[in-house]
Amino acid sequence: MKFEPKTLDFDLSPYTGLTRESWLEAGRYLLEGIFQNIDDFQKPVVMPRKETEITYPHLKDSQEAQAVQRTAEVFEGLTRSFFIAAPMIGNLPDLTVCGYPMAEYYKNQVLRVCTRGDALYVGTYEDQQEITGHTDPYRTFQQTVETCALVICLWVSKKQIWDTYTQAEKDVIAGFLESYAHASTVPQNWRLFNMLDMAFLHMEGYPIQKDIMRDHAQAILAYYAGDGWYRDGHSFDYYK
């Protein structure tokens, strides 16, 4: 079923008619599409797969590679859906979708993926290196990307989720984030992921390695090509 906004105001929004309420309706529509596939509050956001050749986990890869990919699958499902849920929660703190209170669901899932020993624990950077046998000391992992998504969402829904954790729970999440924030990253726009991790930790009173932050910052400035465009290897990215 396609999305059809119920609220339109062409005086306020002459081209599309879409208003703030329209976007909240769109967010609910997208979340319902996700959560109709989640049959238990404790289960992660892992969508049904149509293929196994292109998207990970790649079933033909080694067991070690699949182990890393499966945790990335859980983490990416959480954080990318959180991109939709976080602003929705910020605007509608009591939002419930498919019977699940969104703030409670994401609060629970975020803590679980960061907690060692939990069935959903996705592992620190050091854990990923251990799984892959330390074959490359500078290896990067998809989880670095997702930590950036996580801190953005925690900031957007700060009052509803982050501020409701106990100090001990915050410390668990911060320790998890710190492992990726200061670890190896791809020497292009991935540097921004590490920077945002460190920025969140710093704003929340956790120590960061400022020399690493400065190094990432000077590199990002060197990538800038003007008018919002940044070099990304042989390509360009636009950031507004």
Language-model features, listed with the residues they occupy:
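Aromatic-lined, polymer-binding surfaces characteristic
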Residues: 74-75, 85-88, 99-240
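Extreme N-terminal leader/anchor segments
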Residues: 1-115
